[in-house]
């Protein structure tokens, strides 16, 4: 096991890049090896004040979410867990962690449960990003975090004995039939996703450079082309319910929805599933800038699916403030940047119409 201490130096760079004040809250993450692929993360509040943050998609989340990135020979190992979108207001207590200044908490997890490490060998582990800060159960800001770089030698035989967190469903056992009001709601959401994505693709390729800079931190033609291409791919994928690269469930077939989660994606299988909150708490479309709705939530999840456009996105940040503070390279691969940009590019929505041919399997 080899540990490279980079956290303090890189956190200083992150704080500078995000233009945070010197006393801004910051989390330091120390990764250590417990046994083979079992890892412990020690998260410390190195700021001067108590902080409350959303720990979904972060350490202390019990779901098989992406807590760290794994690399073998500088190539990232595919993540086989879930990426989910959650509420940004009205959060429940079980989604929040409060940490006093100088305090720590620990989280142990097995990286082999959400990645194929059966070939063994040297694996490098690290993580960085921003975690949403919460005030009165609402996302109110962001806290940057960064870990050390941990290098471990994986015993292939031991890694092969670790149960996979997600067991793929056989198509014959899908019980979540999309019918009734939920089928109607998802059909409307997909139509709206097509319109949003097409409008966003046009804005990305030939719209205001200042506005593109606002969301993606650059105006380079290569980035504008890449963003536009992803939006076009999403519009294509969402244009039908009969076939395509993704399978879209009206309800959760895996049991990972909870009182805060709107929807999630299983990128390794190009599966998307909606949760109850998608239908009960979200409007079909919002006319409020940067607010959540069904269409941009579906769009957010489509960006995660590599079958739609590769590579799929990550969840480096949530919400406008945090997402627009990312570096250009992270913004390009952050799901919420696409949802926020699309939300701020209102198209002229067509009247309801039957979905056209061939892309998304809706079940």
Swiss-Prot record:
Residue ranges annotated as propeptide in the record: 20-172
GO cellular component: extracellular region
Active site: 301
Cofactor binding annotation: Binds 1 zinc ion per subunit.
MF terms in GO: metal ion binding; metalloendopeptidase activity
EC number: 3.4.24.39
Gene Ontology BP term (one): proteolysis
Keyword annotations: Cleavage on pair of basic residues, Disulfide bond, Hydrolase, Metal-binding, Metalloprotease, Protease, Secreted, Signal, Zinc, Zymogen
Binding-site residues for Zn(2+), renumbered to this chain: 300, 304, 315
Organism domain of life: Eukaryota
Disulfide bonds: 178-250, 257-275
Listed cofactors: Zn(2+)
Compartment(s) where it occurs, according to its Swiss-Prot or TrEMBL record: Secreted
Main location: secreted
UniProt catalytic activity: Preferential cleavage of bonds with hydrophobic residues in P1'. Also 3-Asn-|-Gln-4 and 8-Gly-|-Ser-9 bonds in insulin B chain
PROSITE patterns cross-referenced by the UniProt entry: ZINC_PROTEASE
Signal sequence extent: 1-19
Gene3D superfamilies the record matches: 2.60.40.2970, Collagenase (Catalytic Domain)
InterPro entries, alphabetized: Fungal_M35_metalloproteases, MetalloPept_cat_dom_sf, Peptidase_M35
Family, per entry: Belongs to the peptidase M35 family.
Function description: Secreted metalloproteinase that allows assimilation of proteinaceous substrates. Shows high activities on basic nuclear substrates such as histone and protamine.
UniProt protein name: Neutral protease 2 homolog NFIA_102630
């Amino acid at each position: 096991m080899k540990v490279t201490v980079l956290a303090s130096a890189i956190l200083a760079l992150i704080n500078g890049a995000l233009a945070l004040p010197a006393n801004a809250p910051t989390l330091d993450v120390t990764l250590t090896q417990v046994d083979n692929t079992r890892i412990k993360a020690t998260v410390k509040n190195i700021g001067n004040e108590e902080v409350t943050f959303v720990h979904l998609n972060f350490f202390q989340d019990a779901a098989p979410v992406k807590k760290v990135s794994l690399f073998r020979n500088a190539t990232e190992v595919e993540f086989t867990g879930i990426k989910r979108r959650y509420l940004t207001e009205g959060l429940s207590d079980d989604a929040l962690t409060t940490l006093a200044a100088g305090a720590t908490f620990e989280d142990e997890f097995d990286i082999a449960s959400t990645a194929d490490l059966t070939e063994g060998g040297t694996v490098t582990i690290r993580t960085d990003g921003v975690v949403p800060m919460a005030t009165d159960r609402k996302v109110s800001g962001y806290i940057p975090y960064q870990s050390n770089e941990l290098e471990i030698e994986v015993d292939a035989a031991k890694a092969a004995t670790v149960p996979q967190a997600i067991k793929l469903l056989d198509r014959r056992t899908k019980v979540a039939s999309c019918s009734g009001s939920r089928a109607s709601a998802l059909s409307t959401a997909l139509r709206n996703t097509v319109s949003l994505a097409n409008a966003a693709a046009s804005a990305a390729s030939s719209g205001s450079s200042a506005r593109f800079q606002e969301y993606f931190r650059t105006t380079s033609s290569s980035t504008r082309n890449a963003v536009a291409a992803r939006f076009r791919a999403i519009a294509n994928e969402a244009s039908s319910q009969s076939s395509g690269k993704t399978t879209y469930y009206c309800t959760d077939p895996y049991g990972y929805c909870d009182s805060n989660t709107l929807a999630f994606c299983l990128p390794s299988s190009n599966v998307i599933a909606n949760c109850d909150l998608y239908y009960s708490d979200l409007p079909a479309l919002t006319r409020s800038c940067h607010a959540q709705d069904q269409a941009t939530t579906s769009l957010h999840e489509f960006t995660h699916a590599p079958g739609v456009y590769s590579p799929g996105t990550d969840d480096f940040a949530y919400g406008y403030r945090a997402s627009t503070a990312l570096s250009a390279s992270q913004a390009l691969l952050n799901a919420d940047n696409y949802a926020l940009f699309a939300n701020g590019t209102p198209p002229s929505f067509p009247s309801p119409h039957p979905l056209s041919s061939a892309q998304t399997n809706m079940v």
